[in-house]
Swiss-Prot record:
PANTHER family in the record: PHOSPHOGLUCOMUTASE (ALPHA-D-GLUCOSE-1,6-BISPHOSPHATE-DEPENDENT) (PTHR42946:SF1), PHOSPHOHEXOSE MUTASE (PTHR42946)
GO cellular component: a single term: cytosol
Organism field: Psychromonas ingrahamii (strain DSM 17664 / CCUG 51855 / 37)
Residues at the active site: 101 (phosphoserine intermediate)
Binding site for Mg(2+): 101, 240, 242, 244
Swiss-Prot/TrEMBL catalytic activity: alpha-D-glucosamine 1-phosphate = D-glucosamine 6-phosphate
Residues annotated with Phosphoserine modification: 101
The enzyme's E.C. designation: 5.4.2.10
Keywords, in A-Z order: Isomerase, Magnesium, Metal-binding, Phosphoprotein
Record-given protein name: Phosphoglucosamine mutase
Cofactor: binding comment: Binds 1 Mg(2+) ion per subunit.
Gene name of the record: glmM
UniProt-listed Gene3D superfamilies: Alpha-D-Glucose-1,6-Bisphosphate, subunit A, domain 3 (3.40.120.10), Alpha-D-phosphohexomutase, C-terminal domain (3.30.310.50)
Amino acid sequence: MKKKYFGTDGIRGKVGASLITPEFTLKLGWAAGRVLAKSGSKKVLIGKDPRISGYMLEAALEAGLAAAGLRPVLMGPMPTPAVAYLTQTFRATAGIVISASHNPYYDNGIKFFSDQGTKLSEEIELEIEAEIDKELKCVDSSELGKAYRIEDAAGRYIEFCKSTFPSKYNLNGLKVVVDCANGATYHIAPLVISELGADVIAMGVEPDGLNINLNCGATSMQAISERVVKENADFGIAFDGDGDRVMMVDHTGYVLDGDELLYIIARDKLRSGTLKGGAVGTKMSNLGLEQSLKTLGIPFERSDVGDRHVMELMIKNNWCIGAENSGHIICSDHLSTGDGIVSGLQVISAMQSSRMKLYELRQGIKKYPQILLNLGFDNKIDPLQDNDVLAEAKRIETLLGDKGRVLLRKSGTEPVFRIMVEADESEKVVRGYAKSIADKVKV
């Protein structure tokens, strides 16, 4: 059955329009409460990123959950993976995150975690949708839920993050630039890195509700790249607005994406004998990653785009690492969802164990030039059904043979058509291939 409200990563949209309104959010909280109340604890944890609309949506969710008889547990600004982790440690029935991740402040979203810290199954999402369409009826007054706040949630999560970094290593003597995107990691990531011994230069740690992801963080790496070089830092680490993505910068200012970080983690696990099976990427992962891993003898498989699909393939194969090139990296031996801080620490651990700089570790992977074009399109004409678009893509695929790839897909969260072309050619040539397909799209 097709979902009516939930997208690929919860419910997301522009605040005040679509579904991101106080009215709908209250109804969503009630509907989710009705479904979740059927099992286990009545506690539901709520975390959010610092964008201004989060306060409004948090209040609406709190009211809806309480009306269904559940106890909302408020944690304030908290990274998405922290909510996943704390949902398990508090034995809550679910966790809810109010965030639009890497999107601008005027968007927001709501996503859920199960009591095991995993994304809700599509079956549960469909159950919640069925309840949304019913009339809201409060439980009896004696059964109403009562909200309370956890004051030490950040401290608990900081200790968890540090526990994933081998105790035999420290960051003494290292200068590290940390960019928190004015998002949910602003009060956590700098402390994690500094408590491990590094001299931290913090950026993006002054959220005002409107500046989340604004020219900073994992989706805008120019500022941290320049800062690392200016400060003569050893490396930089950047997160997105909700803290589930990570990108890194070596001492030269070069930006390492999720593909390169996955390679470094996989290689380190292979060397230490802790690699279980292989590594999972997505259809967007660079062909160079696949070939570099195979050179090491590490199996590699691709899932559909989205961390949910990455995790599903990891579970199917019984593998412990997977990533998207956007910086969602899952290390399931630590947590069952993408965690920017924890994943970054695994890369830093690889630096420590190999006694190599980030610059040296990235030399093992040769990436092909990859061009990604994002196009708005006319909703009346599906580009994936447009014969002109498909014919041009097929022509280029035939031309490239096994030396490159073409991938066409629509975004699951916004009306955007994505064209990806990569090949063992110059960037100029690859861009030309992508543009020739884009020229066929009716916008």
